[in-house]
Design a protein with these regions (language model features):
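Compositionally biased low-complexity segments at domain edges in trafficked proteins
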Residues: 87-111
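Beta-strand-dominated extracellular/periplasmic modules and repeats
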Residues: 1-88, 94-96
Length: 111
């Protein structure tokens, strides 16, 4: 899959994809490019990017509450921002987020 951005979110505390998780994606100029929810398998396709710095914001607190997970007030994680750079438009940028209510792991995947 050449070029583009894709996101895959998985709740490792319960072993399920994070379907319905709100994700915002902002481009190099700070403009909002995507404000959408992940699909049933926890995935979201982003736009074809330009080079520059991007930010994805994952609304994990709202998602866990919607799943019926009891969270403290305030929640340990409410939103998870992830800033990343795109230098080569021929490459695909896959962003897997593995999360629990208390922590997360984000990296550039190989999808």
């Amino acid at each position: 899959m050449p070029g583009g951005i894709s996101i895959h979110v998985y709740d490792v505390s319960r072993g399920v994809p994070a379907a319905g998780l709100r994700v915002e994606l902002r481009g190099p100029d700070g403009k909002l490019l995507v404000d959408a929810q992940t699909a049933k398998p926890g995935t979201l396709e982003g736009p074809t990017p330009l080079t520059g710095a991007y930010e994805a914001v994952f609304h994990v607190g709202d998602w866990y509450r919607a799943q019926g997970v009891a969270l403290p007030t305030p929640a340990f994680l409410e939103v998870v921002p992830y800033r990343f750079g795109i230098a080569d438009l021929a490459q695909h940028y896959h962003l897997p987020l593995k999360m629990t209510p208390w922590g997360f792991s984000l990296f550039r995947g190989g999808a």
